[in-house]
């Protein structure tokens, strides 16, 4: 054991809790959407994609981590490490880029930078395809030699190799690519789109002399923006910051928990996403009931 058995027990219990909550909520999202025709709208296709991404993380990542935590190390070998790392990365990236597509959709529909544009089913499918392509450009390279997946932290889950400059894997270039394309860019897009969305609501409220309806709309959008931004940062910023520090300070001494804690903070969107995008949607709530 790299740390005390109690830490592995706590990790296993945490993963069990994520599975216990994340699987039924995301599965329910899929079921309700497929069951109720009125929910099959272009916007909800993106929400459905989030649920699929979260299920990838739950079934492909969380279950494996819970199992390996019972043994105190990653017992599934190189193939198991590649599969766990791939599915966990794929699910997280699909969710991340789905949030970007959703932010762009909200900006275009509400702020109308393109006059007479209507978000259609074809646009939604293009957005979904984009999210999958971007996710695969992050999750596949470590399987084919551009970087690699290795056990990290407490050695119960696998992630991209930020830790070494292993010869032949070009870890440095892949990590730099990840930290340019797969973190600041999506974060900047989300901030820009929701910032413009909030400004548009404020302008509409001012033009209508702060009517009760527009005040309520401004409040709802403000709350959604705050939740989105905080949720994104809380989940991803600790992991990205620690991973970048490790990459820049390879060879430095740090304990296994140093990387374990932020990596499992980043797994919480499997619970956050349905809460933010589904439970705050009245139509979804009514259909679930």
Swiss-Prot record:
GO terms for cellular component: membrane; photoreceptor disc membrane; plasma membrane. Keywords: Cell projection, Chromophore, Disulfide bond, G-protein coupled receptor, Glycoprotein, Lipoprotein, Membrane, Palmitate, Phosphoprotein, Photoreceptor protein, Receptor, Retinal protein, Sensory transduction, Transducer, Transmembrane, Transmembrane helix, Vision. GO terms for biological process: absorption of visible light; G protein-coupled opsin signaling pathway; visual perception. The keyword Phosphoprotein applies. CDD domains: 7tmA_MWS_opsin (cd15080). The record marks 84 as: Plays an important role in the conformation switch to the active conformation. Residues 33-44, 105-123, 196-223, 280-289 are cytoplasmic. The modification N6-(retinylidene)lysine is found at residue 267. Residues 1-7, 68-81, 145-173, 246-257 are extracellular. GO terms for molecular function: 11-cis retinal binding; G protein-coupled photoreceptor activity. A motif ('Ionic lock' involved in activated form stabilization) lies at residues 105-107. It is found in: Membrane; Cell projection, Cilium, Photoreceptor outer segment. It is a multi-pass membrane protein. The chain crosses the membrane at residues 8-32, 45-67, 82-104, 124-144, 174-195, 224-245, 258-279. Its main location: membrane. Belongs to the G-protein coupled receptor 1 family. Opsin subfamily. Photoreceptor required for image-forming vision at low light intensity. While most salt water fish species use retinal as chromophore, most freshwater fish use 3-dehydroretinal, or a mixture of retinal and 3-dehydroretinal. Light-induced isomerization of 11-cis to all-trans retinal triggers a conformational change that activates signaling via G-proteins. Subsequent receptor phosphorylation mediates displacement of the bound G-protein alpha subunit by arrestin and terminates signaling. This is Rhodopsin. It comes from Batrachocottus multiradiatus (Baikal sculpin). The gene is rho.
